[in-house]
Amino acid sequence: MLLAHAYPDANRVVTGILELTLNAIEHGNLNIGYKEKSRLIEEERLDNEIERRLSDPLYSSREATAQFVRRPDRLSLHITDQCKGFEWRKYLNFDPERAFDTHGRGIAMANKVSFDRIEYRGNGNQVITALQLGTVAPALVA
């Protein structure tokens, strides 16, 4: 992902950028909920459903935007989608209840590994990431 190369450590942020962008598209603009995504993955139909919705006039005109800002002390990324929002707080941290689900850890990965901070605004359809310049990636637990 090209945008990751704007950061001092592209490997640190690439997963977070990808996960938050995919969330804006899949869960936001295409309105695929958590349980529905679980079912579609189980039935091996997620890709087909995404393609179907991308062709559906109800969803096809929706846009997700990403704005990258470089400041002297930090880098930030603001991603906005056109969804009705969601309850994002329960996804900020890793949850043992979802540990073995086929998805559902992207926001926590972005929050705990990729960026120093993420913040949701509005109804949950806007996320802002921050990475302080000069910080070191958190150590991963073995």
Question: Language-model features: where?
Answer:
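Alpha-helical phosphate/pyrophosphate-handling elements in metalloenzyme active cores
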Residues: 1-9
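General structural signal for secondary-structure boundaries
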Residues: 6, 31-33, 69, 76, ...
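Conserved ATP-binding N-box helix of the HATPase_c
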Residues: 8-60, 111-112
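Glycine-rich/acidic phosphate-handling loop/turn and adjacent ATP-lid/helix
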Residues: 35-104
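Flexible, glycine-/charge-rich segments associated with ATP-binding catalytic modules
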Residues: 74-78, 82-87, 91, 96-100, ...
